[in-house]
Amino acid sequence: MSFIQTKYDISGIFNSKSEISFESNGHLDVKYAGNKTTETNPINLRIQMKNVHEKLEIDLKLRFTFESECSRCLDVNNVKKEKSFFDDFYKNQSNDYDIDFASDEIEISSLISELILNEMKLQYICNNECKGLCSECGNNQNLATCKHPKKNLKESPFSSLTELDL
């Protein structure tokens, strides 16, 4: 899978009231806290740019799938998301996404990355009924129930100190 197109030619848009539309499919490396986009799950990008009174309106629609590891059972799942973005950018002003409108090409990979990162959770749970891993043997309790006897938890974490011969 090729990388998603993130550079676009906007040379003609500031000289007219025209509108430019692009569509691109591909891969972009985004990783965060056990989540990551993969080459097997393409990102679909639709973008429309329009010049309106010395500002550039960007309307962006993003469909993507990322792999996320469950915080309880450590299973990897594919999470599908859709994200929309609309904002106005002025040619001679700086912006939060480091997009330079002074040149004939704009690079929007930072904008796409931020939209994807905002959808990735720090702690992902595969479902509400996830039982997680066994604290004794480490087996996934969603797949099988452990047969070993349960460990008797003592009242205090310091109660094992009473067993020391001093």
Where are these regions (language model features)?
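Structured interface patches
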Residues: 1-166
